[in-house]
């Protein structure tokens, strides 16, 4: 029999401790259930090849002797002890706790061998129960830790895998039922959103027109301006404003918020119309001045130049211009008198523009004294030069009852009752806008009266 390299504690001697048999394989190979290749002939077993390759200390533990349970005496058994017998039989199904009488070699301070034979359900140990259900991975981890650190105390805790229990914080969130919305409220909200989409479209069109008036239109001749796009956008705004005024205002808080948003968008569109009309008035006046000075060419830029002739008599055909094949009857006047054609077109444009502007102000609820259309002089010189254009704006409370009027008062820098702006240069946006519109209208219609065009 080979001796274990593990030294016995000093308190035991060869006389008190009987010789015991050791395992044929080391603890590591036995726990992993692999073949242990070591030296069996030597008294002190050498380290096996696997432990040497792993760099671990090779330990051979002793075999636990077979435990013989004492047979109970049938004569001593009584019916009173049947309950104890049932308890004993039920307790045999669980592994016994090692006591002082069970021969277990706990490692001393100078050794690192750990005897875990009572955890091994293999055939080397003849236990009356089949298995204790200990995971082999846990045992291997304990052995590797004890061998690697060289400690003698058993510090590894055997933790069995815990079952997957449902977390107390995980719960299925049930969707709360959405509050029921009446059909009338839902219809009102849908109508307000559709109205906002329409106003947004008009706003984008007006912004594009304002850019074209400032950049593209000055490069063209006055009778080629696409004025229909501006008038149609102004008319669509008027339709949306009338649609907004027909909707009810007592349809809930959300409907009120949507109405306020639409009102801000409508005021923005109105401001764009005012700016476009102001820029267009300046452009019309500039083109009329050029036409009056003889610098404006007829339609399509074809100015007729009679061919040189030595004859004194010229035919009327020689003095007629070359007409464009696509010429309409409405543009025929531009060939005969370009200046009068430009002046007549400008007067018509201003009349239609002021009329659409006045109707939009009425649909928005803007009082005439605060609007722009009523402050523009159409054919009459009602305002003297340098007169304060903001003086006609009244401060009465009834003029500021409409929400659009209050919003417009905040937008214009010279609000109601402002008497500090005495000139167009020192005034705010509203004063400058009114000054430009009044000046352009006064000069254009003054020329029209001189040529008997203004009624």
Curated annotation (Swiss-Prot):
GO terms for cellular component: nucleus. CDD domains: GAL4 (cd00067). Keywords: DNA-binding, Metal-binding, Nucleus, Transcription, Transcription regulation, Zinc. It comes from the Eukaryota. Residues 75-88 have a biased composition (Polar residues). The keyword Iron-sulfur does not apply. Gene3D superfamilies: Zn(2)-C6 fungal-type DNA-binding domain. Residues 89-113 have a biased composition (Low complexity). The keyword Isomerase does not apply. Residues 1-22, 68-113, 296-317 are annotated as: Disordered. GO terms for molecular function: DNA binding; DNA-binding transcription factor activity, RNA polymerase II-specific; zinc ion binding. PROSITE patterns: ZN2_CY6_FUNGAL_1, ZN2_CY6_FUNGAL_2. Monacoline K acts as an inhibitor of HMG-CoA reductase involved in cholesterogenesis. Its hypocholesterolemic activity might be useful for lowering cholesterol levels in the blood and reduce artherosclerosis and coronary heart disease. It is found in: Nucleus. SMART domains: GAL4. This is Transcription factor mokH. The gene is mokH.
């Amino acid at each position: 029999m080979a001796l274990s390299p593990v030294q016995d504690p000093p308190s035991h001697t060869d006389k008190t401790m009987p010789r015991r048999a050791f395992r044929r394989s080391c603890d590591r190979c036995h726990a992993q259930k692999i073949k242990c290749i070591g030296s069996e002939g030597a008294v002190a077993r050498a380290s096996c090849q696997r432990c040497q390759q792993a760099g671990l200390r090779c330990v051979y533990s002793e075999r636990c002797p077979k435990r013989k349970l004492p047979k109970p005496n049938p004569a001593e058994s009584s019916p009173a002890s049947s309950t104890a017998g049932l308890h004993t039989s039920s307790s045999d199904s669980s592994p016994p706790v090692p006591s002082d009488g069970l021969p277990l070699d706990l490692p001393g301070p100078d050794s690192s061998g750990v005897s875990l034979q009572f955890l091994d359900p293999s055939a080397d140990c003849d236990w009356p129960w089949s298995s204790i259900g200990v995971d082999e991975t846990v045992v291997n981890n304990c052995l590797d830790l004890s061998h690697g650190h060289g400690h003698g105390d058993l510090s590894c805790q055997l933790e069995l895998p815990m079952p997957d229990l449902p977390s107390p914080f995980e719960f299925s969130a049930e969707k709360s039922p959405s509050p029921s919305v009446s059909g009338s409220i839902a219809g009102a909200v849908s109508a307000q959103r559709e109205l906002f989409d329409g106003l947004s479209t008009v706003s984008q069109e007006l912004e594009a027109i304002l850019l074209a008036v400032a950049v593209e239109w000055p490069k063209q001749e006055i009778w080629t301006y696409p004025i229909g796009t501006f008038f149609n956008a102004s008319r669509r705004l008027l339709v949306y404003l009338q649609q907004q005024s027909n909707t009810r205002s007592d349809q809930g808080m959300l409907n009120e918020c949507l109405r306020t948003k639409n009102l801000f968008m409508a005021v923005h569109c109105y401001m764009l119309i005012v700016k476009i009309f102001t820029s267009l008035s300046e452009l019309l006046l500039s083109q009329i001045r050029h036409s009056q000075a003889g610098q404006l060419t007829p339609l399509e830029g074809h100015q007729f130049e009679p061919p040189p002739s030595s004859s004194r008599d010229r035919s009327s055909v020689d003095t007629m211009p070359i007409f464009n094949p696509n010429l309409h009857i409405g543009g025929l006047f531009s060939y005969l008198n370009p200046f009068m054609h430009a002046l007549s077109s400008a007067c018509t444009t201003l009349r239609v523009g002021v009329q659409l502007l006045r109707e939009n102000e009425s649909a928005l609820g803007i009082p005439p004294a605060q609007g722009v259309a009523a402050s523009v002089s159409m054919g009459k010189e009602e305002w003297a030069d340098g007169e304060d254009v903001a003086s006609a704006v009244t401060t009465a409370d009834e003029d500021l009852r409409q929400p659009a009027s209050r919003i417009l008062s905040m937008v214009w820098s010279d609000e109601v009752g402002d008497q500090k702006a005495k000139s167009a240069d020192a005034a705010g946006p509203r004063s400058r806008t009114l000054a430009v519109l009044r000046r352009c209208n006064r000069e254009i219609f003054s020329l029209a009266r001189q040529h008997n065009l203004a009624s």
